[in-house]
Amino acid sequence: MSDSESSNITSTNTITAIVLASGLGTRFGGQKLSHEIVINHNPPFALGVISALNVKPFVDHVICIVQPEDKALKQQFKFHGFTTVDNLDFEQGLSSSIKAGIRFCQDNYKNPSNNHYMICLADMPYIEADTYKAVTKQFKARIKIHANTIIRPVLTDNKKAGHPVIFSNKFETELLNLSGDDGGKPIVKQHGVDSVIVDDAGVLADIDRKTDIRL
């Protein structure tokens, strides 16, 4: 089920950002993704919406995966013009959101075989614009040479891999076979990735608790 202003979108070698916003957020103590925060002296936005706003300039489409009954968050996404997709299986973990997003693309894009997937976590609002730009640029260069491409950022300081992660559509079947809360980790472990070195601590900074919010 989806709430979309556009269907049958024409896709030609496109990237769709799938913003995973249907998590339970139990450690936060309240409606985490609807909680408003301020970044860089900008007006306050719902935490879950910021990732979608940040990635939007660098991809072709953005879809936001939500719990069916999370009306407050849906309203926030709609206000900013984003498509929302209901994840009926949200209690089954992160992988269920990825699968809901891919199925939406399969059902609504005229050429889904030309569409690739950037997996974004809605609780990671501190990723910088330059990081989104770098990973998309690297992906577009690599996909011309290697159909089986996975791109993710790696932090300069400690060489830890972060988000977002872009999967070419050659991994679509494997993504649809994921289960549990590990997301695409099993695919990354099996196939490896091309890394983009970034000086951006935001690629590792998810918000699990209120104390994770930068003041």
Task: Please name every model-derived segment.
Residues 3-13, 17, 173, 177-215:
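Conserved alpha/beta core of the MobA/IspD/sugar-nucleotide pyrophosphorylase nucleotidyltransferase superfamily
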Residues 83, 149, 192-194:
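Conserved beta-strand segments of alpha/beta enzyme cores
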Residues 71-78:
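Acidic helix N-cap motif at the loop->helix transition within catalytic regions
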Residues 12-71:
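N-terminal glycine-rich phosphate-binding loop and ensuing alpha1 helix
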Residues 58, 78-81, 189-191:
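Short, structured coil segments at secondary-structure junctions
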Residues 18-22, 65, 120-121, 152-155, ...:
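Short beta-strand segments
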Residues 91-169, 173:
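Conserved beta-loop-beta/alpha segment of the NTase-like Rossmann-fold superfamily
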Residues 81-92:
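Conserved donor nucleotide-binding strand/loop of the catalytic core
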